[in-house]
Amino acid sequence: VERSRGLGDVYKRQSLYKGAKPVLWSVVEKTALADAEVEYEDHTSNTIYVKFLIKNSTDKDLIESNIVIWTTTPWTIPGNRALAYGKELDYSLIVVEELEEDSLAKINDKLIFASELLENVTKEIGIKKFSTKKKFKGDNLSTCECEHPFKQLGYDFIVKPFHGDFVNLEQGTGVVHIAPGHGDDDYVLGIENNVDIIQTVQDDGKYNQHAVGFEGEHIYKVDHKIADKLEEFSK
């Protein structure tokens, strides 16, 4: 009875709501897992760099340049709805001038990375020569509006960058791609900034109808298809 009254009080205060959040999930057993049930092992992940084209910004120098992210989970790209930067971090806008033969970047690409990671990222991407056009603090990204890299598949919505306390310079590009339905940090940032929380994966590990262009594909087997589509649509 007391529990029912307590629940009633919560309801009266309009503090009771229905929501969703990411949980540890077994696609084999099709059930949620507790932290104590999970054991970690060394695993080699497929990693990709992805460009998000800036279509609008109060900083006109950034328009038509690309914010670049790095991820170890390519399968989460269909669930992307935002980006995260560090507001006090230093970033650079570069223009590509010369490439290695096997690079997927393009001459005259305008790319944005954290300044401290510039040397490492350009080497990994296969950029031999570039010029730096602008240096700025992360807060300059706050007014940017980006295209989703799968816009041509129907992902026709704005992807906005937000400050994230978890963004660091340990690896990657200094910008994190945010899929609010697939990670704790992503979820919290999404809630705080009213970003849509989209679930793209079914209980069995296969994409649902929200992963347009990849419906029915298993997330453990789709990385190369994701990469191929990103290359196809790269501008």
Each model region followed by its residue ranges:
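Non-cofactor substrate-recognition interfaces
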Residues: 58-67, 74-235
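Active-site cores that bind ATP or allylic diphosphates and position pyrophosphate for catalysis
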Residues: 23-68, 75-77
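Amphipathic alpha-helical
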Residues: 12-43, 121-132, 136-141, 147
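Single conserved hydrophobic/aromatic residue that forms the stacking wall/gate
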Residues: 1-11
